[in-house]
């Protein structure tokens, strides 16, 4: 792997920390330095711009990255000092057999204790995690506590992932994005997946899901979690299926239960659980154009039909909650019957499952387990709003987490664009987190460059949604970049953008000279036709004419300051 710090850093940026009510609550932000504005009267300084930062310690000059050692245990003291946890021996077979460089006994809630952020919020406690996200979001900590207590927001924070920097998912906060990584049976390695993790958080992924289905699933996930400053999500049914040789009919509750515990002990922060795919919903998909497109949903459907039994994730849901609340693993209720084509959008199967997800949400909340709801999928623009409204009604305001949605099916190779259109719209309507889509969607396993394109595309969609919702901190960066653009501060334009390297690269293709970084034009219009340069001249003339008129008024009025 190339030098981590070099590829994680951003130009003209430095890591700064905002301290909370205690010395160990230090919230990272990226501060972008700006050049001064040049005026006829001299230079006027521009204040640096602070932006939300997901890069973790990797961009801290005092931190020495080493993937074999992992990250500092940021939250360990917060977790232990509450007095609700104890160290245990690994319960899972894989956990006991693992011989990895991260030697650590897993934590679990003490008997009779609950360790979820929702539990503490309901008790009126503002945890350090809540204060941390409040500073990040520039919002009052009490609002954070209230939203988590009501189930309208979640802070994914497994007690066995103390390396993670707390973040919040909810409609009152910044729209978040998730990036999917993970190996397959035919591609990738542990090193590649860790590199994709770092690449994803470098570009702004708020959470990362490890969807590995190939070899060394346990080991790959361990390296990802130990080196991740953001919450990690999984789909446990994938690993459970691997344990039974890839044959869905051989799945059992016991195999799945052990997988839940194994992943919870490792530190997985949220798990997609397809408990809403009920036996009697499966026939509703028969006449669909694209059937069941969710991997987890299709696995469960195959099991249900083979045994002609109800989904064991549905029948054992109370037990799932009992397990996960011991580690503060949030549940992401999977949309196993989501539409996989525009033709199937908003159909009976999709909304039948959504109603069940609402029932399961209430059960999870009774256990103080944090919940978010997964959503589609492939939805034409005119049907997007209904999805948000139904989810809010049926699922009692729980955060909505959607894959896109793609608004058309005709653009393989460009589905990061077809889905970002839908993502921006659904985010503006109130979706809390957007799962990215890369250009490789429907075509193959994404590589490092695909991850970059997918994350940046979805940061655009999420930010556009924040602007539409009127988030108080959203427009600061836009205004700073617009000002830099009008003043021809090219380097500041690049540095304020979501992808500075790409912006600089495109500019320098035609105007590579350093002198071009102060030119009052680009290659699009040239020096004679630049509208902003012409606007500068217009403003200058108007101001001059205005000053002349004021001077004439002064003379006509007797040249006296006092009348």
Curated annotation (Swiss-Prot):
Entry-linked InterPro entries: ThiC, ThiC-associated_dom, ThiC/Bza_core_dom, ThiC/BzaA/B
EC number of the protein: 4.1.99.17
Pfam families xref list: ThiC-associated (PF13667), ThiC_Rad_SAM (PF01964)
Cofactors required: [4Fe-4S] cluster
Xref: Gene3D superfamilies: 6.10.250.620, Radical SAM ThiC family, central domain (3.20.20.540)
Catalytic activity: 5-amino-1-(5-phospho-beta-D-ribosyl)imidazole + S-adenosyl-L-methionine = 4-amino-2-methyl-5-(phosphooxymethyl)pyrimidine + CO + 5'-deoxyadenosine + formate + L-methionine + 3 H(+)
A molecular-function term among this protein's GO annotations: zinc ion binding
Keywords per UniProt: 4Fe-4S, Iron, Iron-sulfur, Lyase, Metal-binding, S-adenosyl-L-methionine, Thiamine biosynthesis, Zinc
Binding sites annotated in the UniProt record for substrate: 180, 209, 238, 274, 294-296, 335-338, 374, 401
Cofactor detail note: Binds 1 [4Fe-4S] cluster per subunit. The cluster is coordinated with 3 cysteines and an exchangeable S-adenosyl-L-methionine.
One Gene Ontology cellular component: cytosol
Function: Catalyzes the synthesis of the hydroxymethylpyrimidine phosphate (HMP-P) moiety of thiamine from aminoimidazole ribotide (AIR) in a radical S-adenosyl-L-methionine (SAM)-dependent reaction.
HAMAP family: ThiC
Protein name in the entry: Phosphomethylpyrimidine synthase
Organism in which the protein naturally occurs: Geobacillus thermodenitrificans (strain NG80-2)
Gene: thiC
